[in-house]
Amino acid sequence: VGKKNLEKALEIAKPREGAKDVVFTTTWRPFFLMPPQVWTRGIASGQFPEDAETEGIEKLAYYISKFGANSLPPMLERLGGAMRDSGIEGFSMGGNTGPTLDGHRLATYAEREGLDKQNAFMEEIFRAYFCEEKAPCDRGVLLAAAKNAGLDEAKAREVLDAPTAELGELDEQMQRFARGVSGVPFFIVSDGKKRFKLSGAQPAEAFLEVFEDLGIDE
């Protein structure tokens, strides 16, 4: 939802007189809602099945255990409504959730291949998870997302085959960008001099206000 609202704001802002010479770029930075060690400990303690790292766990059951059977339905109703308002169809809580380390590693690799490809990769991952009931830890899902985003499938496979690939860059970015962040989506909008931070799935109007504060106005 946050991604779609940002894109809507960019579509509105780019034709403006004050934005004609402005180059907008979007870069995705890492953040773990459930860090890899949480999955490792959960498997070791028996909280999660032994194959959770590769197969995931049932998404709906997990969120019920986290938020409660009474609290979850209205939360999902609000999320589904926000998705529809943003033009996203097919929202579903079916399928599995799971570790996202491999997806983060591929997103880090994708950044070097071009920000457009990284953004396309994230779009594929979000669609697979929220609309197609596919697990974020499924190797086939990740490779398909990479291919559909225009990334070299063989190179993406090499990243997945090497457990430590991209971990150094990933850790460095976590240290630089994730400190002080408690949830996602979280946006940093900057012109290189001034920075504005927005937390949550902000409406397009919120981004437009920031653009105006940066001098990108009508």
Language-model regions: role of each:
Residues K3-Y129:
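Structural alpha/beta surface segment adjacent to cysteine/selenocysteine redox centers
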Residues V1-G18, F24, T108-E218:
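C-terminal cap of thioredoxin/glutaredoxin-like
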